[in-house]
Regions:
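Short, acidic, small-residue-rich periplasmic hinge/interaction motif at the N-terminus
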Residues: 20-61
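Gram-negative outer-membrane beta-barrel transporters
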Residues: 343-347, 418-424, 432, 567-582, ...
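Periplasmic-side early beta-strands and strand-to-turn transitions of outer-membrane beta-barrels
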Residues: 161-162, 170, 182-269, 302-315, ...
Length: 758
């Protein structure tokens, strides 16, 4: 599979480079520093006409706020939480207090209008990102599945808007290195990036850092205009090879005389993640007689492999190797009237995708795991007169092979009505999805009782298939009222109020990581029956545990937006209040006791209420940005059969976040050193709970960052620091084999570098 991916990439690149650029399309020089107009095929309304909260970043913002990946947007965007833990595979996303640690995300990711189908690709390094828009709240009407609470739409740099050469090299703490270079000439653009880090976390067992990482990314882009048709081909490829998973065992205190504490990272088996990702997308915009037709087509290939010491201790208990070979195809058509009426405009579209994922996820049980997880459990159910159960093997493999297919088809429409100061939006999407899974799990062992002289061979298998079909209706209604008077407009002041009601959903799926527990139960029952002992229960998990349903929500919002441009001052502020009601919320749960897997389960009902705001002020060289989010997300009805968590806080998302950044640029009258810029920022994360019961909590903490930049005629020099106060905090919590683990945040770190652009 790796060979096929590399071959495809090389052939595509060869074709890309071989394209003629003799008929060069006219290009518009872009400064890359000011606000830029989006080229998204779905943006019928401007940013100021949207009746939903939108946060926009340009290329200048990415450098100033040290935004190098989607994870760096957390906290800056109100209500958005993307904790940095595990590896690049663990792209957990929470928005407005609701999200999930695994499987389908609550916000969609679009890169140049191409939907990124698999969440394993959500954690990537920004390379020549020209603009990013984060739409908050359900975006199901236009974007469909997995956009239940928002969409991150990213646009990369194109030779259609900028011509030139860019490059940068930076070096920092933990021997971290990043270098990137790009050229945009004629119809063709090309960019490449490499990064390396020795890591920040030491594994006490090996004495080496466990989170060493290397990453490579490539992008090639070709644009062409033929008559009234624009063609845009974007090919990207990336390779990731990293360690990670610096999880620390939590030793709980007695709550009175002894406080709990974290042990160092200390595990004996390999934990790593490798990923090869290739995505080729073609955008075509055609101006026909009466309509504008846009087409977006993509082919997405993913091969990744994860090795995991699943007990994360020095004991030899059990390990997981999960590999995926995935291919997906997407197609979308969008139609808009070529000439809209004064009072009405619209857009309509159809979307479809198909995906196949071949997954192998064998779990290897080692000596300590066989004894503690299988034999001790089995012998507790065997009468003493039978003796003790023994297994011949020092280790054995529970194989799990999956063939998973998904498809989705949808049709949607949005209309925009203008009546005086009112702008009304009404939309509807019909969305259908089908999921299929074939599974084959098995294990072979030899066992005997202590009183027996010979071992008995035993084979356990668990084969079958599952399928699910869903149909979702996703309506949206919104209103925007322009309260600006003529006198306000003359003074450069704009005031708008907005309200919306919308529905969103994220897909259901299959729990592939629970099959080792199911097969353990199958083995237990099979061995016991051979001994004439019959258990009353098949165990905590069974076939019903392999499927989970889609999560849906209805969102109600009220807000306002203020802007002022006068006497060199530029002020923009917004505030939004929301109420979100969710059904079948997807929650990550762990089997009771010493289970080895994890699975997604549907909670009954939940809700989230909150207020979020943003403000930005510019005056001469001074810039101030701030954002705030206050949210209360709770279970309305959730009983897992042992405990009733109704009324408790939803875990993993803080109750509030506050972000502020101030910077000043000193312009110098010199042809050598043109300006000096300095900035500082602070992020406060509020209290969060780590589990459904709420007895484990993360206290509020503050992170401080800053940077200093010297801009010369042809290049910039910069130094930057993050977590300057050296704050100690946790980013993640989970349980394995009955033990609790945390990951702590990265320590104080610095970096410096040089960038060029000409």
């Amino acid at each position: 599979m790796i060979y096929n991916l590399v071959t495809l990439t090389v052939l595509s690149v060869s074709a890309f480079v071989g394209l003629s650029s003799e008929e060069t399309s006219p290009v518009r020089k872009d400064t890359l520093t000011e606000s830029v107009v989006t080229s998204s095929v779905k943006m019928s309304l401007t940013e100021t006409e949207q009746a939903i909260p939108v946060t926009t970043f340009t290329m200048k913002d990415f450098g100033a706020a040290r935004i190098g990946s989607p994870k760096n947007l957390a906290g800056i965007v109100p209500g958005l939480i993307i904790p940095d833990y595990g590896s690049s595979m663990t792209s957990t996303i929470y928005m407005r207090g609701i999200g999930s640690r695994m499987e389908n995300p609550v916000i969609g990711l679009y890169i140049d209008d191409i939907p990124v189908i698999d969440k394993n690709n959500y954690d990537f390094s920004f390379l020549d990102i020209r603009r990013a828009d984060i739409f908050r709240g359900p975006q199901g009407t236009l974007y469909g599945r997995n956009s239940m609470l928002g969409v991150l739409s990213v646009e990369t740099l194109s030779p259609a808007v900028w011509q030139g050469v860019r490059g940068a090299v930076e070096y920092g703490s933990a021997n971290s290195l990043r270098a990137n270079a790009s050229v945009y000439k004629g119809n063709v653009g090309a960019a490449v990036m490499y990064s390396h880090s020795d890591g920040f976390y030491v594994n006490d067992f090996s004495g080496r850092n466990c989170d060493v990482s290397d990453n490579v990314a490539l992008r090639f882009r070709y644009v062409k205009r033929r008559g009234d048709t624009d063609i845009d081909n974007i090919l990207s490829a990336s390779y990731t090879d990293e360690g990670g998973y610096p999880y620390r065992l939590w030793m709980a205190g007695d709550g009175a005389s002894q406080q709990g504490y974290l042990n160092p990272v200390n595990y004996n088996d390999r934990s790593s993640y490798k990923r090869i990702s290739v995505m080729d997308g073609v955008r075509v915009n055609a101006s026909l007689r009466s309509v504008n037709l846009s087409s977006v087509t993509s082919l997405q290939l993913l091969h990744d492999s994860m090795d995991l010491d699943q007990d994360f201790t020095p004991k030899s208990m059990f390990t997981l190797n999960q590999t995926q070979n995935q291919v997906a195809v997407t197609q979308e058509f969008v139609v808009r009237p070529k000439v809209s009426r004064k009072w009405w405009d619209s857009q309509s579209g159809v979307f479809a995708f198909a995906r196949y994922n071949g997954m192998d996820a064998p779990v290897t049980f080692l000596q300590d795991g066989i004894r503690q997880l299988i034999l001790d459990n089995a012998n507790s159910h065997i009468p003493s007169e039978f003796g003790k159960l023994e297994i011949l093997e020092d280790k054995f493999v529970i194989s799990s092979n999956f063939a998973i297919w998904n498809y989705n088809v949808a049709a949607y429409h949005e209309s925009y009505f203008r009546f005086g100061r009112w702008l009304l939006t009404a939309g509807l999407r019909l969305d259908h999805e089908g999921d299929f899974m074939g599974y084959d799990s098995g294990a072979d062992i030899h066992f005997k009782m202590s009183k027996m002289s010979e071992c008995i061979p035993y084979s356990a298998d668990y084969k079958g298939d599952e399928s699910n079909f869903y149909f979702e209706v996703l309506p949206k209604v919104s209103a925007l009222f322009d309260a600006s008077t003529r006198r306000m407009a003359e003074r450069g002041l704009s005031l708008k109020f907005m309200a919306s009601v919308s529905r969103g959903y994220k897909s259901g799926g299959f729990n592939t990581q629970i099959f080792s527990d199911i097969l353990q139960n199958t083995m237990m029952n099979g061995i016991m029956s051979k001994l004439g002992i019959y258990l009353d229960s098949e165990g905590e998990v069974n076939a019903a545990s392999t499927v989970y349903k889609p999560e849906t929500c209805i969102d109600y919002e009220l807000g306002g937006r203020l802007s002022l441009t006068r006497n060199g001052h530029s002020l923009a502020a917004s505030v939004t209040a929301y109420n979100i009601n969710c059904r079948n919320q997807q929650i990550t749960v762990f089997p009771y006791g010493k289970g080895t897997g994890r699975m997604m389960a549907n909670a009954g009902e939940s809700r989230s209420r909150g207020v979020e705001s943003e403000v930005a002020w510019r005056w001469k060289g001074l810039s101030i940005n701030a954002s705030a989010s206050f949210m209360d997300a709770r279970f309305v009805s959730y009983d897992d059969g042992r405990n009733d968590y109704s009324g408790n806080r939803i875990p993993y998302s803080p109750s509030s976040s506050l972000y502020a950044r101030a910077g000043y640029s000193f312009s110098l009258r010199s042809d050598v050193l043109r300006s000096i810029s300095v900035s500082a920022d602070v992020l406060r994360s509020g209290e969060l709970t780590w589990n459904e019961s709420g007895d484990l909590k993360q206290s509020p903490y503050i992170l401080i960052g800053g940077d200093l930049r010297f801009s010369f005629k042809w290049f910039d020099l910069f130094v930057a620091g993050e977590n300057l106060s050296g704050t100690e905090y946790c980013t993640f919590y989970f349980k394995s084999v009955g033990n609790s683990f945390f990951q702590t945040g990265k320590p104080r770190r610095f970096r410096g570098g040089v960038s060029v652009e000409f």
